[in-house]
């Protein structure tokens, strides 16, 4: 539908369509409202998850792809100079935190949907915090301003994953698409093999990287300058606050949505780099990261909801490049669907491998000898 639109037209559409993230946040009160008079209230607790992963891929197919890039000489400088795009990301913080607190109250008070409905409510809130909260946090922690860094930290603290703020920038972006990166899935590895190591290593590696930073400055590792301590204390304060306000069920809700959000993040990590690798030179060093080391997806609907996260190839080639000016490359490896569809595909390993393994082999024609799961030797989590 959008393939033949000019870059100028697409930029005009996207400027306001980035507000589509509000659909996810506002779906929570809408679904609660629908559940109150429903004979099947538990359905409405799950309905956001059904919409995201069931209807989302269909909307991607309906609206098609967006291959348009801004003109580097004229449009990109204009886009970079507009504070509107920064305010758009910052606006997610009060909306998401407010929704999270409100949803905890509903989780405790609305007993009509029982434990099944409560499970659906946790999955729905976790999907919102993963698909919007962590995605926006990812954008913000790459920025230099203290305000954006703090906003990103708050969103990550709300899902108990402050380590991402450190490990993603100083670990993942350094070692992406190599065996040294726990967030880069190896060829032949299922998402269920990938997740346990990603949880453990990324948490521990964040502390290791922060310790390295502090030691280089001659500072104590467990001093007040360790930002992970402060962010995890904020997560603890939020947990205690939810317990004080809503009781033990409030704490269950807070931890449950955090686990769902983090799991969604790591599944997306799996999708973004599956089977791709940076070639190692004779000197033992890996080639420089470029736009061929991440899977790209130009399906316009999910790209708008996710702030262009699916133009991941350009993001890894130019990590500081803001979302509104990320570019499409024809020679980047291309996903057959947007992230919503790819997450569903990843959860069914035989189907995932049937779709994705031929794409990886075709992309690395002549280098198939490197595409072995045995290559995925993982670093010790020290």
Curated annotation (Swiss-Prot):
Membrane topology: Multi-pass membrane protein
Summary of the function given for this chain in its UniProt record: Catalyzes the hydroxylation of n-alkanes in the presence of a NADH-rubredoxin reductase and rubredoxin. It preferably hydroxylases C16-C24 hydrocarbons.
Molecular-function GO terms, alphabetical: alkane 1-monooxygenase activity; metal ion binding
Name the record gives this protein: Alkane 1-monooxygenase 1
Annotated TM spans: 10-30, 43-63, 90-110, 121-141, 146-166, 236-256
Induction of its expression: Induced by n-alkanes when cells grow slowly during the exponential phase. Expression decreases significantly when cells reached the stationary phase of growth. Repressed by citrate.
Gene Ontology process terms (BP): alkane catabolic process; lipid metabolic process
Family: Belongs to the fatty acid desaturase type 1 family. AlkB subfamily.
Cofactor note: Binds 2 Fe(3+) ions per subunit.
Annotated Fe cation 2 binding sites: 173, 312, 315-316
Catalytic activities: octane + 2 reduced [rubredoxin] + O2 + 2 H(+) = 2 oxidized [rubredoxin] + octan-1-ol + H2O
Enzyme Commission number(s) of this protein: 1.14.15.3
Pathway assigned in UniProt: Hydrocarbon metabolism; alkane degradation
Residues that bind Fe cation 1: 138, 142, 168, 172
InterPro entries in the cross-refs: AlkB/XylM (IPR033885), FA_desaturase_dom (IPR005804)
Gene coding for it: alkB1
Annotated organism of origin: Pseudomonas aeruginosa (strain ATCC 15692 / DSM 22644 / CIP 104116 / JCM 14847 / LMG 12228 / 1C / PRS 101 / PAO1)
Name of a matching Pfam family: FA_desaturase
The protein's required cofactors: Fe(3+)
GO CC terms, sorted: plasma membrane
Compartmental location: Cell inner membrane
Signal peptide: none
Matches recorded under CDD domains: Alkane-hydroxylase
Key words of the record: Cell inner membrane, Cell membrane, Iron, Membrane, Metal-binding, Monooxygenase, Oxidoreductase, Transmembrane, Transmembrane helix
């Amino acid at each position: 539908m959008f393939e033949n639109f000019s870059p100028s037209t697409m930029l005009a559409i996207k400027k306001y369509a980035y507000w589509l993230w509000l659909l996810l946040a506002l779906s929570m009160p809408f679904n609660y409202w629908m559940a109150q008079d429903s004979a099947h209230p538990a359905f409405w607790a799950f309905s956001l998850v059904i919409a995201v992963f069931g209807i989302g891929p269909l909307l991607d197919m309906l609206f098609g792809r967006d291959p348009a890039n801004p003109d580097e000489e004229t449009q990109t400088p204009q886009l970079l100079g507009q504070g509107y795009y920064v305010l758009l990301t910052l606006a997610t913080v009060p909306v998401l935190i407010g929704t999270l607190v409100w949803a905890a109250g509903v989780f405790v008070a609305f007993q009509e949907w029982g434990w099944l409905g409560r499970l659906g409510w946790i999955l729905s809130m976790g999907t919102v915090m993963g698909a919007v909260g962590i995605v926006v946090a990812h954008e913000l922690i790459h920025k230099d301003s203290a305000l954006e860094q703090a906003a990103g930290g708050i969103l990550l603290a709300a899902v108990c994953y402050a380590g991402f703020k450190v490990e993603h920038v100083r670990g993942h972006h350094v070692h992406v698409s190599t065996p040294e990166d726990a967030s880069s899935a190896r060829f032949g590895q299922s998402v269920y093999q990938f997740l346990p190591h990603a949880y453990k290593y990324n948490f521990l590696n964040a502390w290791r990287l922060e310790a390295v930073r502090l030691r280089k400055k001659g500072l104590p590792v467990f001093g007040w300058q360790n930002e992970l301590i402060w962010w995890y204390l904020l997560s603890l304060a939020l947990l205690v606050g939810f317990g004080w306000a809503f009781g033990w069920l409030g704490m269950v809700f807070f931890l449950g949505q955090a686990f769902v959000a983090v799991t969604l993040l790591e599944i997306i990590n799996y999708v973004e780099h599956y089977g791709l690798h940076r070639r190692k030179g004779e000197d033992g060093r890996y080639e420089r990261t470029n736009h061929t080391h991440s899977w790209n997806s130009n399906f316009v609907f999910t790209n708008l909801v996710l702030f262009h996260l699916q133009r991941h190839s350009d993001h890894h080639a130019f990590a500081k490049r803001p979302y509104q000016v990320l570019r499409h490359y024809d020679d980047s490896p291309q996903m057959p669907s947007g992230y919503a569809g790819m997450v569903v595909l990843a959860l069914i390993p035989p189907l995932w491998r049937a779709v994705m393994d031929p794409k990886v082999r075709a992309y690395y024609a002549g280098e198939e000898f490197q595409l072995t799961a045995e290559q995925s030797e993982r670093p010790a989590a020290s």
